[in-house]
Amino acid sequence: MTSTQARRMRRPVLRAAIDAGARCTKADPELFFRADGQSPATWQAQRAEAIGFCHGCPVRAACEELALRDGDGNERVDDLVRGGRSGFELVALRELQAQRLTAAITADEASDQEWNKLTDLAVELNREARRMPTRSGGMPHQAALLRQQNERIAELAAKLAVVRTARRARTGWEVAA
């Protein structure tokens, strides 16, 4: 994965790529973090090893992008390696790319809201479809309740289709396969 590809991805896709392909999942997590009281010389050697380890990772760019969006790194203390970058490097990159990162974070949040709306509608549609109208009041009353339920189901399905179609169009799917 390239940096350009990673920059275009939303947070859940970056996270999934990292979860599926990161080399560090089998490594000792302590390699990537400075221990309390660790000497600068020892940390520099460990940091160099961690950075080298990251450079062989197929999802390094995704990890770096997520680290930038998450605000990892500290301008006062170099205490971690993520995405093949030291904490200081992440801070510097974040400052250089502040405008792009702000836009990416905003898009992530909008995507999260859209996803939440999509899942909320799907859950509500499922609930409504499983609901059994009351049997009290006789057949005419039950028929009216069923008609209302069917109208509500059609309304929810239409709302769900609008959100799903917009989401697919925005992400380049246009038509589902």
Where are these regions (language model features)?
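Immediate flanking context of iron-sulfur cluster ligation sites
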Residues: R11-P58, E64, L68-E75, G87
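Polybasic, low-complexity binding patches
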Residues: A45-A48, E65-A122
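Short flanking/linker segments adjacent to small metal-binding domains or redox-active Cys/His motifs
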Residues: L93-E174
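Polybasic, low-complexity association/targeting segments
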Residues: M1-L14
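Compositionally biased, low-complexity repeat tracts
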Residues: P58, D79-L80, R168
